[in-house]
Amino acid sequence: MRTGSFPVCLRITPYGNGGFHMIEKVYCMEEIAAIIIRHTFDKDGIEFVTPGDFSQQMAYMHHPKGHQIIPHFHNKVERTVHFTQEILMIKKGKLRVDFYDGKCRFQKSAVLEEGDVILLAGGGHGFEILEETVMIEIKQGPYAGDADKTRFEPA
């Protein structure tokens, strides 16, 4: 678990089609705790929303019919992963994600709806399911079992 106090503020990234809350970045001080791509976001081409040094990369892609992506392989590259970063894709329903600082203190919440995608990049987090929810979770492996996370009671 990371130590220190991380006050959280919500910053809204100003790209998209002018809609409200298109891509949101939740910060713990200067560290990104989460990136949310709202289901209303739309932009032609490829938009990487994560910094290049994140161990989990997330991009939004919108291509026209007939566009081709050149066949390719991904090469074996040794990487070091210090913290698990997970992506949740909300297929159905609504949930609230609560963000916590390094001292297990609640900081802020965000509501996710059908079609939203979130990358949980750092800090503590918990969820309350507001409607029946179906989601897909994607994270790095190999699975580390109980060593992967620390559960806590909010301060």
Identify the meaning behind each predicted range.
Residues 101-122:
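Short acidic-glycine-tyrosine-enriched beta hairpin
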Residues 64, 83-98:
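Glycine- and acidic-residue-biased ligand/ion/polar-headgroup-sensing regions
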Residues 71, 97-98, 118-120, 125-130, ...:
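Short beta-strand His + acidic residue motifs that chelate non-heme Fe in jelly-roll/DSBH
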Residues 61-82:
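Conserved short histidine dyad/triad with adjacent acidic residue
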Residues 4, 8-10:
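Short, positively charged low-complexity motifs
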Residues 23, 126-155:
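Double-stranded beta-helix
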